[in-house]
């Protein structure tokens, strides 16, 4: 079954230092699928929405390979915590904390995110 994008005027906004940045329309985020967005500094963020509607934003760069691919990873849960698995080497990153579930010494940046 394919989900149709929802129609809404809400935007996904990220907290960058002391300001909010509009990353995309909320309707662009399908539950369980990631979207990459370009940040003002040239970096990338991976945006996710889970099936309950919770939003997550992490750095898109896989720290193990250096490739900007986390937005294309597979999502799931581990012990009730949402994660994305890198599509390259399959390391899993907690979407709320950015910590790698397979090597806790490694993490990706996380961002405060909201729909407004």
Locations of regions flagged by a protein language model:
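Short cysteine clusters
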Residues: 62, 86-89
């Amino acid at each position: 079954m394919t989900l149709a994008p929802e129609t809404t005027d809400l935007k996904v906004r990220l907290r960058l230092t002391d300001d909010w940045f509009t990353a995309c329309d909320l309707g662009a985020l399908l539950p369980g699928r990631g979207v990459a967005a370009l940040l003002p500094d040239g970096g990338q963020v991976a945006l996710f929405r889970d099936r309950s509607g919770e939003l997550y934003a992490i750095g898109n760069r896989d720290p193990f390979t250096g490739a900007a691919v986390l937005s294309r990873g597979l999502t799931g849960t581990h012990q009730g915590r949402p994660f994305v698995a890198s599509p390259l080497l399959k390391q899993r990153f907690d979407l709320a904390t950015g910590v790698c579930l397979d090597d806790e010494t490694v993490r990706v940046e996380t961002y405060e995110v909201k729909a407004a």
